[in-house]
From Swiss-Prot:
InterPro entries (alphabetical): AAA+_ATPase (IPR003593), AAA_lid_4 (IPR041445), DNA_helicase_Holl-junc_RuvB (IPR004605), P-loop_NTPase (IPR027417), RuvB-like_N (IPR008824), RuvB_C (IPR008823), WH-like_DNA-bd_sf (IPR036388), WH_DNA-bd_sf (IPR036390)
This protein's UniProt keywords: ATP-binding, Cytoplasm, DNA damage, DNA recombination, DNA repair, DNA-binding, Hydrolase, Nucleotide-binding
UniProt EC number: 3.6.4.-
Protein name: Holliday junction branch migration complex subunit RuvB
Stored CDD domains: AAA (cd00009)
Annotated stretches, region: Head domain (RuvB-H): 254-337
Positions contributing to ATP binding: L19, R20, G61, K64, T65, T66, E127, D128, F129, R170, Y180, R217
Family designation: Belongs to the RuvB family.
Native species: Geobacter sp. (strain M21)
Gene assigned in the entry: ruvB
């Protein structure tokens, strides 16, 4: 079952293509990253050169793919999109690289999942715009260098720490994408509603924004589900009351928590005295994979102050207790002797 407020892509998100802006001036939020990219793009265009390689990292659903497409549009070049898991062999990467034209953009999503062997092929391609090809086998094998057109690699990752240092060091532009503010999300939701021909009140857009976990992909997904509710059980207009009723039906609370978020926090609070408790123990208690908890659920809980990671395990914060109407335990007092 697909998690409604997961920031990962789903089939339902294919509609996102029609919502994506095509110019930096239309892109909402990420002002620091947007400002830097605009400067570097203008400079590269002025010199008639390819833009330096770009690494975009941050939680899923914040607009990394959109920015990659905007870079290509602003540079006036083509974009070839792929992902790390798809490029299984060096030959797969070689086929992609040799089909690029001068100044084209190659977008690799989930670039942290490239194999070490494929990375080795990518290094000279990024640095020297050359492809090392081995001809023959055994003692008679030899390497020839194939020149490549100067291109821009745009890599996207949710786990920058998993990138090898040699790969990370070859990116000239590195930008971190942050969670969006409520005002930015409300603007995005209003724009999406206009494109889809939906009627939405400002307070309805803000209510959706508050529960979208700072993520445009989640905001657009919730908008489509609330639209269905408004169409069937209301007069078609998404007001704050309609949004509140629809989200209550979907079991998404005022913080944007769903059942799994609540299960994680309540497990720590009720079963393990607020923590610290190990990740594997939490995973076993709620029947979920440890990696899924760490990569999908925890970032939002930690960034919003509901969960702490400590060397001894996960700890529920006072904000988590307050959210569920519980009284947080007093911190232990240190002994004098």
């Amino acid at each position: 079952m697909t998690r409604l407020i997961s920031a990962d892509k789903s089939e339902d998100d294919l509609l996102e293509a029609s919502l994506r802006p095509r110019a930096l001036s239309d892109y909402v939020g990420q002002e620091k990253a947007k400002g830097n990219l605009g400067l570097f793009i203008d400079a590269a265009r002025g010199r008639g050169e390819a833009l330096d390689h770009v690494l975009l990292y941050g939680p899923p659903g914040l607009g990394k793919t959109t920015l990659a497409n905007i870079i290509a549009c602003e540079m006036g070049v083509n974009i070839k999109s792929t992902s790390g898991p798809v490029i299984e062999r060096p030959g797969d990467l070689a086929a992609i690289l040799t089909n690029l034209e001068a100044h084209d953009v190659l977008f690799i999503d989930e670039i942290h999942r490239l194999s070490h062997v494929v990375e080795e092929i990518l290094y000279p391609a990024m640095e020297d715009f050359q492809l090392d090809i081995i001809i023959g086998q055994g003692p008679s094998a030899r390497t020839i260098k194939l020149d490549l057109p100067k291109f821009t690699l745009v890599g996207a990752t949710t786990r920058a720490g998993l990138l090898s240092s040699p790969l990370r060091d070859r990116f000239g532009v590195i930008s971190r994408l942050e969670f969006y503010t409520h005002d930015e999300l409300a603007f995005i939701i209003t724009r999406s509603a206009r494109i889809f021909g939906m009627a939405i009140a400002p307070e309805g857009a803000m209510e959706l924004a508050r529960r979208s976990r700072g993520t445009p992909r989640i905001a657009n997904r919730l908008l489509r589900r609330v639209r269905d509710f408004a169409q069937v059980r209301a007069d078609g207009v998404i007001t704050r009351a309609v949004a509140d009723q629809a989200l209550a039906l979907l079991e998404i609370d005022e913080m944007g928590f769903d059942m799994m978020d609540r299960a994680i926090l309540l497990t720590i609070i009720d079963k393990f005295g607020g923590g610290p408790v190990g990740l594997d123990t939490i995973a076993a208690a709620i029947s979920e994979e440890s990696d899924t908890i760490e990569d999908v659920y925890e970032p939002f809980l930690i960034q919003n102050g509901f969960l702490n990671r400590t060397p001894r395990g996960r700890v529920a914060t006072a904000a988590a207790y307050s959210h569920f109407g519980r009284i947080a335990p007093e911190p232990p007092q240190g002994k004098l002797f």
